[in-house]
């Protein structure tokens, strides 16, 4: 086991804070409408230019192991915020840095770290409750477009195209983002169905850059049982090999010899194939397989209705224009089922939903209806160069996540104003001692940090702007885009409540852990000079003369 280096107390905290600052300072320059770009070096190809906080955070690794631990913990904040709400990563990083910086100062001054953490936690709980009170529903197209615009760095075209997509396929509809061929963004709405099952083996992946499987004009085999014996699939595979078309297998499971053979055939290019598990469980799985069959014009191979997999032919298979499979979900686009049958199936599900007494069943039936009747909207991102395309695509994806979050939990005033208002409205949070009270103050002070950073990035003095906003009421705030003050909602500067809430909760959670850190352990750094001595062994070549 390698020797370890151990740091205690203030030595550990100073190193950790240095790492936090390196990562946070790199990320926070991107915040706000006048945030700057960060250029990331890539081992091959052109460098990546981005304003996406989590993309910057993921690139940072520090040489000093103790500083790196601090940086990695803040990276976790950005990743968690991104996973939960798909946006707000920079806000979360700025909040975490502010809480850690103030918290470690208080610890150095002799305050109890555990009480500070409890105070911070109490303030955050109160703040989240107050955020819910401030939140307003985001239902109309205009509000959705404004949220998308803000998240896409004040690019109105992106906000509008997302709002249009949501209008076309419904708020529950499926919206995907692709790289387009034109200079402008385009919106395509395609009939399709998505379900939450990914590929059964990563060896099916044929688009390594996105980690997905894409099948063009595939046959779709639907089986209501586990498939483990490859003999059952041979007649279908032989028929397919003659057509040269790909195959998607949707079954209860595909395992053992069957899965291994499919993977080998796919890798050798004999048959293009991918397999996914059928969505749902029990009776719901049977119903969803039937939905897919009607959508694609296929038949579900089920022994209970006298159909055996070995006797299945190509006529029993469904077809679609395209299928996209990621590790988490499968999207069937443009199924070739009969329109009349699809409408009849939707009407049947609608009747079931109306008759159902269970809220859960009702929700699931409505979900199935949306998947059958709704479509898939594809936003094709247009740009002049590949570098710009990648940067723009990341912004569109961020904006899409933000609008979904806004529809889910509503919106609050943007530009860091909501957190400032929340901090001023939280009255006396109940605390047990002075250290906890200081923890509350740390959290409330940190809630001003995003506003200060937005102002700083816009070339203004953060403290002056924060003071002006604090003196206002309601949605009064600072519009960094055009350097004016006014009602943020009227100016169309909105943040999804979910994004702001997630950023605050994750930042305080990780910051609390860092404040209560007393010891850090890392491998001792091996001295490069010692390792270099091995080079002398090259002289051993002379031993050839001994023969």
Swiss-Prot record:
The UniProt keywords, alphabetically, are: ATP-binding, Chaperone, Cytoplasm, Isomerase, Nucleotide-binding
Annotated EC: 5.6.1.7
Lineage at the top is:
Bacteria, Pseudomonadati, Pseudomonadota, Gammaproteobacteria, Alteromonadales
Principal subcellular localization: cytoplasm
> Gene3D superfamilies recorded for this chain?
GroEL, GroEL-like equatorial domain, TCP-1-like chaperonin intermediate domain
Any one cellular-component term (Gene Ontology): cytoplasm
InterPro entries in the record, alphabetically? Chaperonin_Cpn60_CS (IPR018370), Cpn60/GroEL (IPR001844), Cpn60/GroEL/TCP-1 (IPR002423), GroEL-like_apical_dom_sf (IPR027409), GROEL-like_equatorial_sf (IPR027413), TCP-1-like_intermed_sf (IPR027410)
Where is this protein localized, as stated in its record?
Answer: Cytoplasm
What is the name of this protein?
Chaperonin GroEL
Please list every transmembrane segment annotated in the UniProt record, as residue ranges. Answer: none
**Residues that hold ATP according to the record:** 30-33, 51, 87-91, 415, 495
List, alphabetically, the Pfam families matched: Cpn60_TCP1
Instruction: Note the SS bond partners.
Output: none
Q: Which reaction does it catalyse?
A: ATP + H2O + a folded polypeptide = ADP + phosphate + an unfolded polypeptide
Name of the gene encoding the protein in the UniProt record: groEL
Which Gene Ontology molecular function entries are recorded, alphabetically?
ATP binding; ATP-dependent protein folding chaperone; isomerase activity; unfolded protein binding
Protein function: Together with its co-chaperonin GroES, plays an essential role in assisting protein folding. The GroEL-GroES system forms a nano-cage that allows encapsulation of the non-native substrate proteins and provides a physical environment optimized to promote and accelerate protein folding.
Q: What family does the Swiss-Prot or TrEMBL record give for this protein?
A: Belongs to the chaperonin (HSP60) family.
Which BP terms in the Gene Ontology apply to this protein?
protein refolding
The entry describes its oligomerization and partners as: Forms a cylinder of 14 subunits composed of two heptameric rings stacked back-to-back. Interacts with the co-chaperonin GroES.
């Amino acid at each position: 086991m390698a020797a370890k280096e151990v740091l205690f107390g203030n030595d550990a905290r100073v190193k950790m804070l240095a790492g936090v600052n390196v990562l946070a300072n790199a990320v926070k320059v991107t915040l706000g409408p006048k945030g700057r770009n960060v250029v990331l070096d890539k081992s091959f190809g052109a460098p990546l230019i981005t304003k996406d906080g989590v993309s910057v955070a993921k690139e940072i690794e520090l040489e000093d192991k103790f500083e790196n631990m601090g940086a990695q913990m803040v990276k976790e904040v950005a990743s968690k915020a991104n996973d939960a709400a798909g946006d707000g990563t920079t806000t979360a990083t700025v909040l975490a840095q502010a809480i850690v910086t103030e918290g470690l100062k208080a610890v150095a001054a002799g305050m109890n770290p555990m009480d500070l953490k409890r105070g911070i936690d109490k303030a955050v709980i109160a703040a989240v409750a107050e955020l819910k009170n401030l939140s307003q529903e985001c239902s109309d197209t205009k509000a959705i477009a404004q949220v998308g615009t803000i998240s896409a760095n004040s690019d109105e075209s992106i906000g509008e195209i997302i709002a249009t997509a949501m209008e076309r396929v419904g708020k529950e509809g499926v919206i995907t983002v692709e790289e387009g061929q034109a200079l402008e963004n385009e919106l395509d709405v395609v009939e399709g169905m998505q379900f939450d099952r990914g590929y059964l083996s990563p060896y099916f992946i044929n688009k390594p850059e996105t980690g997905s499987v894409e099948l063009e004009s595939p046959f779709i085999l639907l089986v209501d049982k586990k498939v483990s014996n490859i003999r059952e699939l041979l007649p279908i595979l032989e028929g397919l090999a003659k057509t040269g078309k790909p195959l998607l297998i949707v079954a209860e499971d595909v395992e053992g010899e069957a899965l291994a053979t499919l993977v080998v055939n796919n890798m050798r290019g004999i048959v293009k194939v991918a397999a996914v598990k059928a969505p749902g469980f029990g009776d719901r799985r049977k119903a969803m397989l039937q939905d897919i069959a009607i959508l694609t014009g296929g038949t579900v191979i089920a022994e209970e209705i006298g159909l055996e997999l070995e006797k299945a032919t190509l006529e029993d298979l469904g077809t679609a224009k395209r299928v996209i499979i990621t590790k988490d979900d499968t999207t069937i686009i443009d199924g070739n089922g009969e329109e009349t049958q699809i409408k009849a199936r939707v009407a049947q599900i609608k009747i079931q939903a109306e008759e159902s007494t269970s809220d859960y069943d009702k929700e699931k039936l409505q979900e199935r209806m949306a998947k059958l009747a709704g479509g898939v909207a594809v936003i094709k991102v247009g740009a002049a160069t590949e570098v710009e395309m990648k940067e723009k695509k990341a912004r569109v994806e961020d904006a899409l996540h933000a609008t979904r979050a806004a529809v889910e939990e509503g919106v609050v005033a943007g530009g860091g104003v909501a957190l400032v208002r929340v901090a001023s409205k939280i009255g006396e949070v109940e605390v047990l001692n002075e250290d906890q009270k200081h923890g509350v103050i740390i959290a409330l002070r940190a809630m001003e940090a995003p506003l200060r950073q937005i102002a700083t990035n816009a070339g203004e003095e953060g403290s002056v702007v924060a003071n002006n906003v604090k003196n206002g009421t309601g949605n009064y705030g600072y519009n960094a885009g055009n350097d004016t003050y006014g009602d943020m909602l009227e100016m169309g500067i909105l943040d999804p409540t979910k994004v702001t809430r997630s950023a605050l909760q994750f930042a305080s959670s990780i910051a609390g852990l860092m404040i209560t850190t007393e010891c850090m352990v890392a491998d001792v750094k091996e001295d490069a000079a010692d390792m270099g001595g091995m080079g002398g062994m090259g002289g051993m070549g002379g031993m050839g003369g001994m023969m």
